[in-house]
């Protein structure tokens, strides 16, 4: 490991300061045998540590009290200088094998703000210099909203199925939406609502609230799976509601048929009788013009028993 050395003439002039500086540098770098260095008279190791000594000498160099030291190349631990030439213009101590990395910081000169000695030293277009690392225009892992909606439709679909509490689904970017806690592949999150959470169609909305004998919520096959934004959603019109009622009746018939039950009546009129048999005694309308009496599941089980 190398040290900071100085010219013999300057070293004789500031022998005490150079000795103290060498001891501080060796102590800071952990050089073997630094504890046996000869300190100037009146200075003891117990009075101040190496960091305080370096700061003290650095302040003296800026004030002009301590003479400036000359940085030499090729100095080893035993202070043998194999190549005592000065550093070339634009060359730093880091470029020379065997020199100290902090050599330029302790030369004693007041470093003023300004351009370097060689302005093209770190330029990428200079021959022999390593090209600079150029970052991409957009960081990796960040995708556009349209790309997220097209590549991760299954994620948005699961979010839309999880939110069935109300007709108006919250926007993707809001904190009330379940999509706010969704982390897409790559660590990204859905940002805006350009490709938002798909809400239920009129048919799905009506059937999910009017079906009877339903054990669990079931999606109607062949429904519209289009993806719309939150701003373009509208409540169902009268035609969509009528279509939803017909679909609801069809679904009730299919589910009751699978369960072995009779289909409920497809009428909007009130039920005149809730008993297992008809007639005026059971509450049927006079003249037998009332709707057929439905057989509900609990009544069928009671009759079979």
Curated annotation (Swiss-Prot):
<protein>
    <recommendedName>
        <fullName>Uncharacterized 32.6 kDa protein in transposon Tn4556</fullName>
    </recommendedName>
</protein>
<keyword id="KW-0814">Transposable element</keyword>
<feature type="region of interest" description="Disordered">
    <location>
        <begin position="255"/>
        <end position="305"/>
    </location>
</feature>
<feature type="compositionally biased region" description="Gly residues">
    <location>
        <begin position="276"/>
        <end position="288"/>
    </location>
</feature>
């Amino acid at each position: 490991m190398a040290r900071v050395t100085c010219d013999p003439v300057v070293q004789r002039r500031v022998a005490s300061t150079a000795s103290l500086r060498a001891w501080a540098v060796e102590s800071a770098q952990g050089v073997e045998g630094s504890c046996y260095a000869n300190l100037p008279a009146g200075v003891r190791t117990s009075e101040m540590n190496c960091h305080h000594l370096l700061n003290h000498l650095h302040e003296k160099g800026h004030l002009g009290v301590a003479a400036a030291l000359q940085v030499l190349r090729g100095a080893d631990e035993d202070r043998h200088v194999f190549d005592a030439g000065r550093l070339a213009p634009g060359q730093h101590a880091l470029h020379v094998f065997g020199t100290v990395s902090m050599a330029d910081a302790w030369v004693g000169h007041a470093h003023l703000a300004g351009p370097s000695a060689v302005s093209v030293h770190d330029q990428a277009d200079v021959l022999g210099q390593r090209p600079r690392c150029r970052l991409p225009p957009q960081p990796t892992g960040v995708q556009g909203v349209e790309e997220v909606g097209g590549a991760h439709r299954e994620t948005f679909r699961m979010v839309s199925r999880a939110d069935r509490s109300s007709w108006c689904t919250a926007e993707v970017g809001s904190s009330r939406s379940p999509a706010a806690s969704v982390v897409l592949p790559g660590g990204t999150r859905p940002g805006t609502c350009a490709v938002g959470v798909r809400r239920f169609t009129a048919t799905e909305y009506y059937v999910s609230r009017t079906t009877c004998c339903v054990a669990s919520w079931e999606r109607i096959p062949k429904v519209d799976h289009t993806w719309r934004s939150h701003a373009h959603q509208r409540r169902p019109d009268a035609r969509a509601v009528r279509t939803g009622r017909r679909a609801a009746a069809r679904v009730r018939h299919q589910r009751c048929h699978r369960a072995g039950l009779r289909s409920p009546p497809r009428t909007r009129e009130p039920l005149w009788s809730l008993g297992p048999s008809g007639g005026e005694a059971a509450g049927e309308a006079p003249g037998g013009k009332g709707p057929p009496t439905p057989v509900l599941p609990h009544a069928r089980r009671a009759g079979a028993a």
